[in-house]
Amino acid sequence: MGAFTAGLARGFFSSVTMGSCRYDVAMFTDYSIQAIAINAIPLIFAITIHEAAHGYAAKRFGDNTAFLLGRVTLNPLKHIDPIGTVLIPIALVLANSPFLVGYAKPVPVRFDHLRNPRIDMIWVALAGPGSNFIQAIFWAVFWILIQGFSINEPFLISMAKAGIFWNIGLLVFNLFPLPPLDGGRILAGILPYRQAVMFGKLEPWGFFIVLGLLFTGVISQWWMVPLSDFFIAIVRPLTSPLRMVFTP
C-alpha cells in the first residue's frame, strides 16, 4: 500500500486560498535551505503518518504484516525509499521538471489476511489519504493560532501553509482511481469481482500511466485542482469556529 505518496504538478495550488490568505506558489520554485526546510518538515510528517496509517488500519482489520515488520511507526526512516523519496524528486528538481513525483517504501499488506478482504481493503486504502486530511486540519489550526496570537514569524507561517497544501495534495493525488494509488485500491474494492480483476491488471503499468498523465497536465488540470479546491472548501468551515474566536 502507498507505493506513491507524492505526485504534485507545480502550480496546481495557485488557485487555492484559506481564509484571506493565498498559498505562495513560489514556495515550490525556491530551493533555498529555508524553503526546503519549510516544505520538508510537513512533507516528512505527511508521508510518515500516511504510511503508518495504512499499516495501522491493516492491523485493525486483521493483517499484522506491517506491524510485525516495524512499519506501524512514526519513524520516517522506516518509510523512506532512497530512490523514490530522495533521488527521483531531487533529480526532477535539478532538471527543472514541470512536475514532482516520488514514492515512499510501500507498506506491505496481505489482503488475504484481512477479515473481509473486499471491504477491508477499501478502509485500509482510505486510511492514508484520511490521515492527510486530518493533518491538513491540524496545520490549518496551527496557522489560525499563529495569526490569532499575532506571531509574526514567516518561517512558521510558511510551514503552516505548506503543511496544509502538501497534505491536501497527497490526499487528492492518492485518491486518483488508478492502481497502485490508494484510489485504485478503493475502486477495485467497489467494482464487481470480474471487473476488479481486470482493473487490477493495470497495476504493473500504473507508474508509467501516472507519469504520462502528470506530464500532459491531465491530472493537474482535471483532478488535482478541482479536488484540492473541494477539500480546502471542507477544511475552511471545519476551522472557521476557531477563526471566529480570534476575529474582533
Q: Where are the regions that the model predicts?
A:
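Hydrophobic transmembrane alpha-helices and their immediate loop junctions
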Residues: 4, 10-13, 19-248
